[in-house]
């Protein structure tokens, strides 16, 4: 048996390791168009900010160590540019432009997602970055050092955007955050995001909500960011953290079915519409366990779980069904901890689902004990059955209840 895996970060690397554990004899080939595999995406902002001092700590495995440990043929800087399902072959392009073909018995797609980069005037100017991989991290780190950056604009206030805002701030950079929506951190409700807004402002971050960027202009003095309101923000660098989209180009080329939400369609066994081709990670869509509606979930833990399940299905046949994930996440925003799981009230309202919510304002521990910190928890649930739909928590550094919410 010959297995080919396309994409070597979260789901792909996990699947390769699991394949070797359950199948000691077959050939496993792992293709990655970048230079690195199996790295810690969530740690990238903290390396840029100097919290993580050693770059090597981001790399869970190198291509060489992974290949030797699991007896996997790891081919970095080898981009799969075409899949031919009828012939069970792929076309690969190397870094020097050479093309070749490989056959497979079963294939796994784990291409991840690509950053949203709208076609705005000036967006390709020097000093405007996205952050998605180790190469992006190196470019940003070098630019910060070589250009003595003093002012930065972060466009987008999701997890990566706010983590970058914090780390740039800690590095002595004056930070402005521009967000098109009326709040930061879209998975949580506005009422839970409001204290985060106050905290960011207290820390010295300039926050522009319900603002969109119209264009950028590069001058000798730096970059000017033009907003829809007519305001301008001067900057030495810009980080685009607008969001990501499933990387589906290869799947579309192969004629695989794309779902309603824009991700690669898979069945309960994570097999695509083509026999013997499976898919995992940020590129797939899957029914939400609470609603049955197709959705996209850009988180590492579900991708890793999918990787383990799909490896078993590729070896033993489609026997293990993936139960789905509800989008559990946790993030640090300066001194605050923000956690959420399941469906927020605004999402339930959007999907016209009957619900009630409960908000509790408490403390991280008993008030009579020193250093108690404010803690807010919000639950969403069905008003009749009491079925829990979701939970959100905001607290302060050192508060473990938000962490426990995340693990629940």
List each language-model region with its residue ranges.
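Mid-to-C-terminal Rossmann-like scaffold of FAD/NAD(P)H-dependent oxidoreductases
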Residues: 1, 283-399
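Beta1-alpha1 glycine-rich phosphate/pyrophosphate-binding loop at the start
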Residues: 1-73, 116, 165-188, 400
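Short hydrophobic core segments
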Residues: 6, 80, 102-112, 155, ...
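A Rossmann-like FAD-binding core segment of flavoenzymes
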Residues: 25-27, 69, 75-96, 101-102, ...
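Rossmann-like dinucleotide-binding cores of NAD(P)H-dependent redox enzymes
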Residues: 59, 151-152, 159-217, 297-303, ...
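Glycine-rich dinucleotide-binding loop and its adjacent helix/turn
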Residues: 109-171, 206, 260, 266-268
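FAD-site-proximal beta/loop scaffold in flavoenzymes
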Residues: 124-148, 224-226, 231-312, 404
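Residue-level detector of conserved catalytic or cofactor/ligand-binding positions
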Residues: 399-407
